[in-house]
A protein has these predicted regions:
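Alpha-helical transmembrane segments of multi-pass inner-membrane proteins
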Residues: 140-153, 166-302, 460, 485-489
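Long extracytoplasmic/lumenal interhelical loops at the membrane interface
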Residues: 358-373, 377, 381, 385-440
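A membrane-periplasm/extracellular boundary helix in multi-pass inner-membrane enzymes
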Residues: 88, 181, 187-194, 299-359, ...
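Transmembrane alpha-helices of multi-pass inner-membrane enzymes
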Residues: 14, 18, 46-51, 243-245, ...
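Juxtamembrane membrane-water interface segments that cap and precede transmembrane helices
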Residues: 22-31, 118-130, 212-229, 418-434
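Transmembrane alpha-helical segments and their membrane-water interfaces
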Residues: 46-60, 102-189
Length: 534
């Protein structure tokens, strides 16, 4: 594969992870499936095309094809059996046929074509087949863009993994530049600068969709919460699951010789933490707290006085960013800035964003936990295979309790389902793992998590190996990958991990780091040696 084309595609893929809800008119819905909202689909499709052409001509780019094919067959096979089981037990075909026509726009065309061919089949039987094909395509595309995307990265850089990390660093740096530049405009908007407001009104429709879901999401403007290029402040938590490990790892294990370089690292950390606090959203704030706890655990396990010192500096910078965020919020609300008021607002911020996480009646928790419990009940009713990929929404009325249906957001979701139709409704669990459990059962959840669990253990072994050999270059990469991958998976407890495509990039880099070719060329961050017998 042409290395320049490969590098440009990978650079665009890494840089574009901030664009996770692109406008409808540029989406590739048929080819993108559930990932069509991500800009990452474009570089991925280019990568698939170039890889396919190169493989056809030279046959030397795909690595470990048998193992990947075996896993793909198992993954698709289990989810397909789950889907067949779900279609067999599905009790809502009549509701679909009697519901809005917009949810089955292509079905009349199928019926008309079959009629012309002289095949007069029962409409409900055709609906079953049509739904089966539709959701089987979803399963295939889901695998291609998730694990398939990670596999492409592994294959592209199998013989030159240090190049992959260099391009990744450049791409993430570009994404940060976009994130901060757009965030600056949004901060000016939050501070009531009219020119910033008018600028966002012009640009936002080109960045993400506007009020397409439930008639109100994503908002045209976010008047009280920072969100930068993302459609939802909570999505920043998924992005920061990569950015915070990226920055803090460089602070702890990177080159500390130049003061200007160190100042740049701490400035990036300050701005990243500040943006998290300005979201006033629980997901990114809880993620930041969790990542700091995880970082401390790693440092205590591999204790070094120097690392602990860096950790204290990191906490100090985050603390300063927290105080600055309170000052900014006070300024934008024209509040008094006395010490008593500042302490009050600090306590209120912590209570609203951290203290309410376990409360069932604070902020949107009632609706969130209602959907979570509904999916748990649904999964427990079919624990082995679930109800089938994409079929869970129809069960909402039967599995939500009367009390849960009274929450405002739940009522809006159910009303939207009646209006748009069952097949156009999502009603997700807002939790990656509970959602997969209800959709695909325990088997589907296991086959999904297996690669993550496997590579996390291998990364831990590699980290131990690098630590005992005092290999600072390798240690930096091993630490970042393990730290970031665990953080990305942790984000799945409050939202889907694929909200930001970065998790699949990190997964691909993790397999590349452990199983990539052990070349000895000089690396900008070290000389990767891999694990013996990896």
């Amino acid at each position: 594969m042409n290395s320049k084309i490969r590098d440009y595609i990978f650079l665009i893929l890494c840089a574009s992870i901030v664009f996770n809800e692109i406008p409808n008119n540029i989406r590739l819905n048929f080819l993108g499936g559930e990932y069509s909202n991500l800009f990452a689909v474009y570089p991925l499709l280019l990568g698939i095309a170039f890889t396919g052409i190169w493989q056809y001509k030279n046959g030397n780019i795909l690595i470990a094809k048998e193992k990947m094919s075996c896993y793909g067959i198992i993954y698709v096979g289990i989810l397909s059996v789950s889907l067949i089981h779900g279609l067999f037990i599905y009790p809502y075909y009549t509701e679909i046929l009697n519901g809005p026509v917009s949810q089955i726009q292509k079905l009349p065309l199928v019926l008309s074509l079959l009629s012309k061919l002289g095949l007069n089949l029962d409409t409900s039987h055709i609906l079953v087949g049509w739904m089966g094909i539709r959701f089987f395509k979803t399963i295939i595309l889901d695998f291609i863009y998730s694990f398939g995307g990670a596999y492409l990265i592994f294959c592209w850089y199998y013989k030159n993994k240090e190049r992959a990390f260099k391009i990744f660093s450049e791409g993430i740096s570009i994404s940060l530049g976009i994130y901060f530049f757009y965030g600056l405009v949004e901060c000016l908007y939050l501070a009531h600068f009219r020119i910033a407001t008018e600028t966002l009104k012009i640009i936002n429709p080109f960045i993400h969709t506007i009020e397409v879901s439930h008639g109100w999401w994503p908002k045209y403007l976010s008047p009280d919460q920072f969100r930068s290029v993302f459609p939802e402040p909570s999505h920043i938590g998924n992005y920061m699951a990569i950015i915070i490990p990226f920055i803090t790892t460089d602070i702890i294990y990177g080159d500390t010789g130049k003061k200007r370089t160190n100042a740049k690292k701490y400035l990036l950390l300050f701005l990243s933490a500040l943006s998290i606090f300005l979201t006033k959203a629980r997901t990114p704030n809880a993620m930041l707290l969790g990542m700091m706890i995880l970082l401390l655990l790693f440092i205590l396990i591999h204790f070094k006085k120097e690392s602990l010192k860096h950790f204290i500096y990191i906490l100090c910078v985050i603390g300063i960013s927290f105080l600055c965020s309170l000052g900014f919020m006070n300024f934008t609300k024209n509040r008094e800035t006395s010490i008593d008021k500042s302490v009050y607002h600090a306590n209120k911020f912590i209570e609203d964003n951290i203290g309410t996480l376990a409360s069932d009646n604070k902020r949107s928790n009632g609706a969130r936990y209602s959907m979570l419990r509904y999916h748990v009940r649904l999964g427990l009713s079919h624990p082995i295979l679930g109800v089938g990929k994409g079929l869970h929404a129809a069960y909402a009325n039967d599995y939500l309790t009367d009390k849960e249906k009274k929450y405002r957001e739940v009522r809006l979701w159910l009303d939207d389902q009646k209006k748009e139709g069952i097949l156009k409704s999502n009603l997700g669990a807002l939790n990656e793992y509970v959602g997969r459990f209800s959709d695909t059962g325990i088997l589907g959840l296991i086959v999904f998590l297996s690669p993550f669990i496997w590579i996390i253990f291998r990364l831990w072994e590699k980290l131990q190996f690098d630590f005992h050999n005092d290999d600072q270059g390798n240690l930096k990469i091993s630490f970042f990958l393990l730290y970031s991958l665990i953080s990305c998976l942790a984000s799945g407890f409050n939202i889907l991990i694929s909200v930001v495509y970065g998790v699949w990039v990190v997964l691909g880099l993790s397999f590349l780091w452990i199983y990539g070719s052990k070349n000895k060329s000089k690396n900008v961050v070290g000389k990767p040696k891999g694990i013996e017998n990896a």
